[in-house]
Structure formats: C-alpha cells, structure tokens
C-alpha cells in the first residue's frame, strides 16, 4: 500500500537525505547526543528552563533555515542551475542541498513540538531531555546547513550565471 500523496515529499526528502544511515552516522547528530549528555544538569532540573530556551531559540533558527533555502532558490537560474541540477537527478547537488534544509526544518519543528510537550509536563525528565536533544541537534545542524550553503556558493563562484553576466 502506498503512502498518501501528502507524505510523498517526506518520503522523497528522507531518501535523498540518506535515511537512517545518514542520520545515525551524522557527526552533527553525534554532537547533539554529546551536548545533551554534557548539559544534563541544565535540562534535568524540574521546571521549564530548557523548554523555554528551545521556544526562544528555535524560531530564529527556523528563520535562518528558510532564509538559506530562499538564497539557494534565488540563485537557481541559468547555467548555475543547470550545473547543480545534474540532469534532474534526484540525488543532484540541488536536491541534496534542499533535502538538507528540509531536514534542518524537520529537526527544528520537532524541537519546538517537544519543547511544548516538555512545558506541559515540567516534572517529567524524558520530555525535557528529548526537547533538549532536538534543540542541540537544531543548533549543530545549523553548521551543516551553513556548510551546504558554502559549498553551493563555491560552485556559483566558479560557474557564475549567464543571466547575470553582460
């Protein structure tokens, strides 16, 4: 049985991103696990401090993500787009960068949702730990997204864009 059409973008993103293997071998994921363990004293206290932190930080990080995606899409024209589309392949650099930003937004959304759950249950340790992990993963994944933008900009620097050259 096939998943509903509304899940198709998620299926495609997950495949292009690399699935569970890419997630579980990601150094950014590992760093988030380490940060969550090291910061145990911060998120394990009864109360809502770590959830409040996530709710105050994540919207700004989401804006960075959407801005980064907008930059990639804005520069996606002419010769540059032809080069990074790699013949329309699903695994092209263009689709990989977009999938990375999509992943970044999924992580941030999970961070926000888990922070709201942690706020609802301030005396429970697990929701607070999960919320902190997704916050940490959002922050570490910001580095990965910035690296994707940097790589795309290096290609743009070499290839340029016929439409912008007179």
Q: What kind of feature is each model-predicted range?
A:
Residues 72, 130-163:
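Alpha-helical transmembrane segments and their immediate juxtamembrane interface regions
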Residues 24-31, 96-108:
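Select subsegments of transmembrane alpha-helices in polytopic membrane proteins
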Residues 50-66, 135:
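Alpha-helical transmembrane segments
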């Amino acid at each position: 049985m096939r998943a509903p059409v509304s899940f198709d973008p998620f299926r495609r993103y997950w495949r292009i991103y690399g699935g569970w293997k890419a997630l579980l071998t990601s150094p950014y994921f590992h760093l988030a696990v380490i940060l969550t363990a090291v910061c145990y004293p911060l998120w394990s206290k009864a109360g809502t401090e770590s959830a409040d932190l996530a709710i105050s930080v994540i919207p700004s990080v989401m804006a960075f993500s959407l801005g980064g995606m907008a930059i990639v899409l804005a520069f996606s024209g002419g010769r540059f787009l032809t080069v990074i589309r790699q013949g329309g392949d699903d695994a092209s650099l263009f689709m990989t960068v977009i999938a990375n930003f999509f992943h970044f937004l999924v992580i941030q959304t999970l961070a926000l949702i888990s922070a709201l759950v942690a706020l609802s249950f301030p005396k429970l340790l697990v929701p607070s730990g999960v919320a902190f992990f997704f916050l940490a993963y959002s922050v570490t994944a910001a580095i990965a997204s910035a690296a994707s933008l940097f790589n795309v900009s290096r290609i743009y620097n070499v290839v340029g864009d016929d439409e912008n050259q007179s």
